[in-house]
Amino acid sequence: MTQKFEMADRFDASAVEQALYQHWEEQGYFKPSENPAVPSYCIAIPPPNVTGSLHMGHAFQQTLMDTLIRFNRMEGNNTLWQAGTDHAGIATQMVVERKIAAEEGKTRHDYGREAFINKIWDWKAYSGGTISQQMRRLGNSIDWQRERFTMDDGLSNAVKEVFVRLHEQGLIYRGKRLVNWDPKLHTAISDLEVENKESKGSLWHFRYPLSNGVKTADGKDYLIVATTRPETVLGDTAVAVHPEDERYQSLIGKTVLLPLANREIPIIADEYVDREFGTGVVKITPAHDFNDYEVGKRHALPMVNVMTMNADIRQTAEVLGPDGKPLNTYQAIIPADYQGLERFTARKKVVADFEALALLDEIKPHDLKVPYGDRGGVPIEPMLTDQWYVSVKPLAEVATKAVENGEIQFVPKQYENLYFSWMRDIQDWCISRQLWWGHRIPAWYDESGNVYVARTEAEVRIKHNLPLDLPLTQDEDVLDTWFSSGLWTFSTLGWPEQTKELKMFHTTDVLITGFDIIFFWVARMIMFTMHFIKDENGKPQVPFKTVYVTGLIRDEQGQKMSKSKGNVLDPIDMIDGISLADLLEKRTGNMMQPQLAEKIAKATRKEFAATPTLPAGGIAAHGTDALRFTLAALASNGRDINWDMKRLEGYRNFCNKLWNASRFVLTNDKLDLSAGEVEYSLADRWIESSFNRTVGEFREALTQYRFDLAANAIYEFTWNQFCDWYLELTKPVFANGSDAQKRATSKTLVSLLEKLLRLAHPIMPFITEEIWQKVKHFAGVEGDSIMLQPFPIVEQAKLDADAEQQINWLKELIIAVRNIRAEANIAPSKALDLLVRNVTQQQAVILSENQLLLTAMAKLTSISVLTAGEQAPLSVAKLVGQVEVLVPMAGFINKDTELARLSKEIDKLHNEVMRIESKLSNEAFVAKAPEAVISKERAKMAEYQSGIEKLQAQFKAIEAL
């Protein structure tokens, strides 16, 4: 080497990462090409909430996405990773409502709708970019100039377009149906926003008197009805029994007198009833229970709504027919002393009144799940409200076929069944929400209640020929957030305009997401996309070809991470590190329950206590590459992941290993990259072959979305082949090889390091770029960034099975000698004589050709091959297959120690022989196993038995000393 090359002792991630990322972004490396001839590869990122900050789930999924994007960019594909954030209607509105309440003592109603929405936009401008900045810290190679927000003008236009077209096609309608109602937030919420909490409740058994003198089979003049919700009694419109329940056969079609309300309601038969639950008789309240609502539809029952939007008892019941229209012929009176009562107060009063009327039969303890709104924090109430709906069955049929016929693949495949189960039992989708923040529904009303749907008010007037002075009022509701995010893959590419981006990048390639939103988001994207996006032949396009479903990231004990458990880990803290004091503040600050905070603090202090290397406690800095590599290495298909700080630490060490290996190569003053004759060694050929096999393994793993196997292939090659063996195998060449051998090894070292960096780059972008910028000059490679270099391919000509086999055998010999040293407590510096016996002719040639390598690696003075029958001096022996590896004992081996070691080796081989004998004596195994398998087992047993004989002979010889 003509000049000394300097390289820092260690990789300082904190000094490198952000500057590198800024450079990448400024240079426009993340931007896709505009050349339509280049094959495209596109991933649309699941848009995180604009309110949010990066959590481990984001870091996990985005690491996998960026790995695919960087790999495909290096493959020469035109890559687009479409990023953006979701306006997150209810979550964002609540954040800003809490903010103005805390800072100004005001509510949104004090501001009014327009001013409050402006407040949200101000908040979004100030703090809405937090998550985007954190995504940069992860190294995400996103074209940020294309970042989208679901409330952008372009996306808002797409939302209006979809709404209007679906309405014109009769697939969007307005109707009164049962929804999850949050009585605190005054909005309908989706099933995803409902949290079912285990609760110790009661099962009340009420007596409903039979009408007209009718009696039960056992002579009673009443039915006992079991319920967990007495407060809805006033809304009952039937009681139901199972059609095959013999106890009540004679009563089907008769009536009972509803207590408190004093109206007759029918006894109906329906298979929904569980004969084993309670008494086998249940009350049917179609206006206040989802199952009862379906029963009511089947039996054309009226619906009696007895609750206000606050979940208080109404002054006057709202009575509707099964079609959702007012039913004036049905009388449902609410007693005066119930009117205005809060629902749980009403519950107590109903129970007390039944007891006073001698109609309370019994109360039993009952475990149940109570549905809570995850934002409002109060029990939700099934409520009949006027809402907008999408009739999704026609869309679902097409979307189901796309998965059935393989246009869309789920990985792992079992999630297809979950998808099918939802899609084949799909219900109309309530898309309206009683919020202010979101896409306002493009519908207007005149004073007569007529509804007009169009993109704008001006379009309404033109379309329906309405005079300018006719007052119109826009619908107050906004659309469910999932409605706009359902358009994500095509609205972000410019639809409804037929943009070049839409033509180039749609269909996208893969969606990486969690199983919990397969229905709420994935299915709706498939439905909407296939309905609105068609190819040039009119065939519906799918939004993506593959859905890769990830598991959850859990804590080390397998618990779900949550603030209330105090076990949340921030990915940025994994990267930068955090002191114990700051971690405690982050985990316990602003907690409502001080007792819980102390428990969390105690657990955190124990888990992240001070250590000699981290005197302040907390979490050490690991850098982004170590975090990404850990996430990839843990990404086993579809399984939840228990986070492991030890693995993170191990992969930080792996980054250091790669850095140190690079230092060894680049600062080696014997490196000779001059032109001239080259003579490649066996080790050179072996490492090239091993590398190419690793490239094949990595590529295959990525094709199967086995990120764990891809990461492991890099780790195994880098640590166990390149660093632990090849770098050591080069030292004898540089010390004693010819000029041609030194040149060959130098070129192999540099070339292989450069290719290895390219192989690892998709998972570990920062350290590979930093080293590559140094190594490219040595390797004679032109280019501005490693990410723009080609990804390594499998070079078939460099696959060399013979070289791999020979090196692996030599490694076994070296390991055998090293083990003898360790077990006999011989100093590493002590040079040894080596004897080998029972070698084949080919093995003898390998030994002869690699004397330099063996003597250096095993610290030997000589290597001698014993001929058949030639006696060896008293030696310590190891077996490598049939070959005996012998180190003469003279002067440095303890007799007792060696006898103990031999005894242990003999026992080990005895156990192997017994295991095989047991297998071969098993008639079922012998009958079913192929002959080749049986022959292989017998050959192994013969080899072990031969080994035992040799070791026993050695044992006897030493014992006789």
Swiss-Prot record:
'KMSKS' region, short sequence motif: residues: 560-564
Keywords, comma-separated and alphabetical: Aminoacyl-tRNA synthetase, ATP-binding, Coiled coil, Cytoplasm, Ligase, Nucleotide-binding, Protein biosynthesis
Enzyme type, top EC level: ligase
Residues that, per the record, bind ATP: 563
Parts forming coiled coils: 892-961
Enzymatic reactions: tRNA(Val) + L-valine + ATP = L-valyl-tRNA(Val) + AMP + diphosphate
Compartment(s): Cytoplasm
EC numbers on record: 6.1.1.9
One Gene Ontology term, aspect cellular component: cytosol
Gene3D superfamilies: HUPs, Isoleucyl-tRNA Synthetase, Domain 1, Valyl-tRNA synthetase, C-terminal domain, Valyl/Leucyl/Isoleucyl-tRNA synthetase, editing domain
InterPro entries noted in UniProt: aa-tRNA-synth_I_CS, aa-tRNA-synth_Ia, Anticodon_Ia_Val, M/V/L/I-tRNA-synth_anticd-bd, Rossmann-like_a/b/a_fold, tRNA-bd_arm, tRNAsynth_Ia_anticodon-bd, Val-tRNA_synth_C_sf
Location (main, coarse): cytoplasm
Motif, 'HIGH' region: chain positions: 48-58
SUPFAM superfamilies for this protein: Anticodon-binding domain of a subclass of class I aminoacyl-tRNA synthetases, Nucleotidylyl transferase, tRNA-binding arm, ValRS/IleRS/LeuRS editing domain
Molecular function GO labels: aminoacyl-tRNA deacylase activity; ATP binding; valine-tRNA ligase activity
A biological process term (GO) from this entry: valyl-tRNA aminoacylation
PROSITE patterns assigned to the protein according to its UniProt record, in alphabetical order: AA_TRNA_LIGASE_I
Subunit composition and interactions: Monomer.
Domain comment in the entry: ValRS has two distinct active sites: one for aminoacylation and one for editing. The misactivated threonine is translocated from the active site to the editing site.
PANTHER family found in the cross-reference section: VALINE--TRNA LIGASE, CHLOROPLASTIC_MITOCHONDRIAL 2 (PTHR11946:SF93), VALYL-TRNA SYNTHETASES (PTHR11946)
Homology family: Belongs to the class-I aminoacyl-tRNA synthetase family. ValS type 1 subfamily.
Job of this protein: Catalyzes the attachment of valine to tRNA(Val). As ValRS can inadvertently accommodate and process structurally similar amino acids such as threonine, to avoid such errors, it has a 'posttransfer' editing activity that hydrolyzes mischarged Thr-tRNA(Val) in a tRNA-dependent manner.
Protein name: Valine--tRNA ligase
